Amino acid sequence: MYDYIIVGSGLFGAVCANELKKLNKKVLVIEKRNHIGGNAYTEDCEGIQIHKYGAHIFHTNDKYIWDYVNDLVEFNRFTNSPLAIYKDKLFNLPFNMNTFHQMWGVKDPQEAQNIINAQKKKYGDKVPENLEEQAISLVGEDLYQALIKGYTEKQWGRSAKELPAFIIKRIPVRFTFDNNYFSDRYQGIPVGGYTKLIEKMLEGVDVKLGIDFLKDKDSLASKAHRIIYTGPIDQYFDYRFGALEYRSLKFETERHEFPNFQGNAVINFTDANVPYTRIIEHKHFDYVETKHTVVTKEYPLEWKVGDEPYYPVNDNKNMELFKKYRELASREDKVIFGGRLAEYKYYDMHQVISAALYQVKNIMSTD
């Protein structure tokens, strides 16, 4: 008999397992896939660590979280400085003085601010009602049309006028010549990949791969006092109220027998007529000298039940539906729901680690 069965070996599940192990709890981790790590999983390709489910870059201002992961594995000093290509022209991201110079030829911050102020004037002082209005209020019409509109509409599969304004609030805008996408104090990627980090968390914990918990829920649940479930909350309840919506992704990975494909880890392709949103060249995340390179093209997809869920569509309709599932979950005495799928929430990696640590602390206070 286990004290806890944890369903899912992504970051939330792995952190919970690591913490419960320290408390001498008997833990079993069940994973539906044939590998650990969830979407943070990395796979070695002759020295290059492949981010199998899209780019994952760790960043945080929280020293406790940074120390937590660095106590487990070594991190490199990777800095995320993506580029964007629009009509064959390169732009720096995030939006900063380099971007403004590339778009308008300006050299000082006041010039750039004046152009943005003039371009957003048509909206006056009204609060932005959708993503398009929010984006123009941040960077003006020109940069919105070139670098945001096509990319975002590909990513979400709908008009920017139909998307909520809050989505674009995550995008940094700076009036300095600073290409570092994140402003966090700590940033990097585990040397040797994220799988090493998850392996370290799961050391000394029983792990079973290739097992779908929901296909044998009652039998498996009987083997533990409590369950920590990190899968989709709607699927747990058999889609009783209908499916929560997501966006999905398709990845096309190519190996090339030359050492350098694009010279940068991430390049966004913002033209609406280019079907993929970005190309990732994996070796630049944790640079290694090789005679080959591996790149991945990322294509956004409509999601349907059975597809891999990536980005929750947190509009009003879906959030109302989620509240119904959350109410059902609150009645499950034996089951604790946590992580991005169980909470129908977009998490950065440092946030999901923090949430898992808090969850274990909460469990221990009520156990």
Curated annotation (Swiss-Prot):
Outcome following mutation: residue 156 to Y: 2-fold decrease in the mutase activity
Annotated positions binding UDP-alpha-D-galactose: 12, 80, 152, 156, 181, 268, 278, 311, 346
Pfam annotation, one family: GLF
EC annotation from Swiss-Prot or TrEMBL: 5.4.99.9
InterPro entries: UDP-GALP_mutase, UDP-GalPyranose_mutase_C
Cofactor binding note: Binds 1 FAD per subunit.
Recorded GO CC terms: cytosol
Catalyzed reactions per annotation: UDP-alpha-D-galactose = UDP-alpha-D-galactofuranose
Keywords: FAD, Flavoprotein, Isomerase, Lipopolysaccharide biosynthesis
GO MF annotations, alphabetized: flavin adenine dinucleotide binding; protein homodimerization activity; UDP-galactopyranose mutase activity
Flavoprotein is among the record's keywords: yes
UniProt pathway annotation: Bacterial outer membrane biogenesis; lipopolysaccharide biosynthesis
Listed GO biological process terms: lipopolysaccharide biosynthetic process
Cofactor: FAD
Binding site for FAD: 12, 31-32, 39, 56-57, 212-213, 340, 347-352
Subunit composition and interactions: Homodimer.
Family designation: Belongs to the UDP-galactopyranose/dTDP-fucopyranose mutase family.
Functional description taken from the UniProt entry: Catalyzes the interconversion through a 2-keto intermediate of uridine diphosphogalactopyranose (UDP-GalP) into uridine diphosphogalactofuranose (UDP-GalF).
Protein name: UDP-galactopyranose mutase
Organism: Escherichia coli (strain K12)
Gene: glf
